[in-house]
């Protein structure tokens, strides 16, 4: 099992990050709520990981905190919820927002997540509300949506490329191509990085 990676960020292509650990590059998929908080390319990072082995692939899912990883593990235990949907859930909302949605039985919010229909949302609430009892708030989770975007987050590439990357990331998270392109065009502003475009796009759809 690979439970933790400590190294240097080589590439950031939402929702995937490439991190160099001792000369080996690991591709790690991260929910956008965690991706937003990553350091810049070339800087050191520590990522808590969940390792999945399939017949056709070996996949790493990454998180900034152990608590976020543990929530992901609880989510994918739910009937009909796999890693891809778990990634989409924690990309559409922060860990704390998901916990509150389950506790409040907020089906309306949950069904806005790509891949989550009414039955899946109801199943998540039924299966997870007891398991999530005792999960704290405040310091346990730090909502990425509350963090102001800094100048360091503005990437040095054109707006067109940033928009294309944002659309590709949304499609990878389960949104339809037309829906992704439409929402990106609605939220994009001059000089926005792809990460900030994705953040605003996801926020507008939940």
Swiss-Prot record:
Biological process, per Gene Ontology: DNA recombination; DNA repair
Subcellular location: Cytoplasm
Family according to the record: Belongs to the RuvA family.
Domain characteristics, as noted in the entry: Has three domains with a flexible linker between the domains II and III and assumes an 'L' shape. Domain III is highly mobile and contacts RuvB.
NCBIfam families xref list: ruvA (TIGR00084)
HAMAP family, per database record: DNA_HJ_migration_RuvA
Pfam families in alphabetical order: HHH_5, RuvA_C, RuvA_N
Species of provenance: Photobacterium profundum (strain SS9)
Primary localization class, coarse: cytoplasm
Ranges where the record places region Domain III: 158-206
GO molecular function: ATP binding; four-way junction DNA binding; four-way junction helicase activity
The protein, known as: Holliday junction branch migration complex subunit RuvA
Coiled coil: none
GO cellular component, one term: cytoplasm
Region spans: Domain I: 1-64
Renumbered residue ranges of the record's region Flexible linker: 144-157
Domain II: region residues: 65-143
Keywords, alphabetical: Cytoplasm, DNA damage, DNA recombination, DNA repair, DNA-binding
Gene designation per UniProt: ruvA
